[in-house]
C-alpha cells in the first residue's frame, strides 16, 4: 500500500501543498480526492458528507476541479475559447452566455490575446493556463493541482504562481518544487509512507 491513515482538513480558500518523492502516492491521493479512483479501504469526507464510493462522489463533482500533470489530453476543442466554454455548453448553457463567461475568464487570467489560437500551437505554460481557465469557468469550490509547473520555464512558472495567488479558492497542490510551494502557502505536508505536516 502507498499510504494509510491520512487526515487532511482543507479550510475555505486555504491552500495546502503536498510534497514527497516520486512514487510516494501524491498523484494517487489527488485522484482519490478528485473522485477519479476509489481508495482500497477507508472513506473520505467532503463538506461533512461521508464518501464511501465513486457513486457517493457524483453530487460533489461540480465542486471539485482537477488539473492533471499532463494537460495535453485534457483539451477537447481546437481553439482556446472553444475549449474553455466546452463544459458550459455541455451543461446546456447557451453559446452566447458561454462566450460571455469564457471571455471574462480569459480576461481574468490575462490571456484574452490567446482567445482564437489553436491550443496545440501554444507553449506548455500557456496550455496550463488555458486548462485552468476551463476549470475555473465552472466555479468549483476546490482546485486540485498535480505538478502545475512541471516542465515549464521560469517565466511560465512565475505566471502560474501569480494566477494561483490571485484565485480565491481552496486548493491542494502537489509539487516537488519547494520554492514554488513556498511562494503559495506555508501549509505543507510530506507524503512518504507517512503523512506529516512540515
Language-model segment annotations:
Residues 34:
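Helix-to-loop junction immediately C-terminal to a conserved catalytic motif
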Residues 118-122, 126:
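Conserved ABC ATPase signature
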Residues 19-21:
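The feature captures the beta-strand-to-loop junction immediately N-terminal to the Walker
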Residues 96-114:
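Conserved ABC ATPase "signature" region
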Residues 143-146:
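Catalytic Walker B motif of ABC-type/P-loop ATPase nucleotide-binding domains
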Residues 43-59:
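ABC ATPase NBD Q-loop/coupling interface
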Amino acid at each position: 500500500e502507498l499510504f494509510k491513515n491520512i487526515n487532511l482538513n482543507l479550510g475555505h480558500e486555504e491552500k495546502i501543498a503536498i510534497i514527497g518523492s516520486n512514487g510516494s502516492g501524491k498523484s494517487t491521493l489527488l485522484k482519490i480526492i478528485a473522485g477519479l479512483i476509489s481508495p482500497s479501504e477507508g472513506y473520505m469526507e467532503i463538506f461533512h458528507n461521508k464518501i464511501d464510493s465513486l457513486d457517493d462522489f457524483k453530487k460533489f463533482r461540480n465542486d471539485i476541479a482537477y488539473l492533471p500533470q499532463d494537460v495535453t489530453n485534457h483539451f477537447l476543442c481546437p481553439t482556446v475559447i472553444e475549449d474553455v466554454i466546452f463544459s458550459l455548453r455541455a451543461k446546456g448553457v447557451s453559446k452566447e452566455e458561454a462566450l460571455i463567461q469564457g471571455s471574462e475568464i480569459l480576461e481574468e487570467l490575462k490571456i484574452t490575446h490567446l482567445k482564437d489560437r489553436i491550443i496545440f500551437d501554444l507553449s506548455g505554460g500557456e496550455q496550463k493556463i488555458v486548462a485552468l481557465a476551463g476549470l475555473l469557468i465552472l466555479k468549483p469550490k476546490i482546485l486540485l493541482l498535480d505538478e502545475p509547473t512541471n516542465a515549464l520555464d521560469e517565466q511560465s512558472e512565475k505566471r502560474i504562481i501569480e494566477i494561483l495567488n490571485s484565485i480565491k479558492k481552496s486548493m491542494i497542490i502537489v509539487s516537488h518544487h519547494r520554492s514554488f510551494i513556498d511562494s503559495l502557502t506555508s501549509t505543507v505536508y510530506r507524503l512518504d509512507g507517512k503523512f506529516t505536516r512540515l
